[in-house]
Amino acid sequence: MAAALPPAIFLMGPTAAGKTDLALALARVLPCDLISVDSALVYRGMDIGTAKPDKAVLAEFPHALIDIRDPAESYSAAEFRADALAAMAESAARGRIPLLVGGTMLYYKALLEGLADMPSADPVVRAELEARAAVEGWEALHRELAEVDPQSAARIHPNDPQRLTRALEVYRVSGMSMSEHRLRQAAGNPEGGTSASGQLPYTVAQLAIAPAQRQILHERIAQRFQAMLEQGFVEEVEALRSRSDLHAGLPSIRAVGYRQVWEYLDGKLSREEMVERGIIATRQLAKRQFTWLRGWGDLQWLDSLACDNLPRTLKYLESVSILK
């Protein structure tokens, strides 16, 4: 008889939904190790605009995969998968439960399904890229491609939107550049593909938290952005801008909120425009996260405003045999 797989918990949801609060509540009563699933929290020195848990919280409840990269560096879904699997294995080896919390849905997908050798088209990612091109121009997207896949950028002209979109789409969906995919295919190396090795060796309980009404989430997003500004978000971005190795084309600086504050400091936006666009960009991020979650199977939904989320979650975890 095969041994039972160790348990793990995924706590997903849109930005500003209350994921961290519930994760901390669970960590207070369960033998959990927290693992961040957030593409912005990996960066050091980016604390306010990412709503990173403060030092006191991190001292009491350490989170794996927070502050593991400098903002000048990139971090892919493939790197996340390797790092998260290592953190989960370490947690399980101690007889504890890995609790993964965050809103970067591509990372969860990479964990559950592995990384395809060459991904198929993703209409959500493609629509996002085309919408950005309509606002920023294809030159901006070509500069982004040059950051993550300079070999493809050298081959693809900025005025070739079809190939440019595809190259960026491959990177966004798989976490690897198109050039890296081609090298692996040429070498006949299936590592990272969706074979049996891509299956996650855990019994996973998948939770999602969000307000029942979308308008409430929009209000929370606006309130949180204003609170970030009061906490020194602009000054945080000023400190990043003072570094000669950082620029607006880097993945870290393209993070929601940071890009808008950077443009404000560049004189491209007024303060009012910066606030408005920052809030709108955060709402658009939440919409994309909801799009992912709507297509997600086997989710237990929780209302952010409910008073009984902790006992409801514990009861659910017992029902799916995560807790014995």
Swiss-Prot record:
Sequence segments annotated as region (Interaction with substrate tRNA): 38-41, 162-166
Site (Interaction with substrate tRNA): residue numbering on this chain: T104, R126
Record-listed E.C. numbers: 2.5.1.75
GO BP term (any one): tRNA modification
Binding site for substrate: T15, A16, A17, G18, K19, T20
Enzyme class: transferase
Protein name (Swiss-Prot/TrEMBL): tRNA dimethylallyltransferase
Species for this entry: Ectopseudomonas mendocina (strain ymp) (Pseudomonas mendocina)
Organism lineage: Bacteria, Pseudomonadati, Pseudomonadota, Gammaproteobacteria, Pseudomonadales
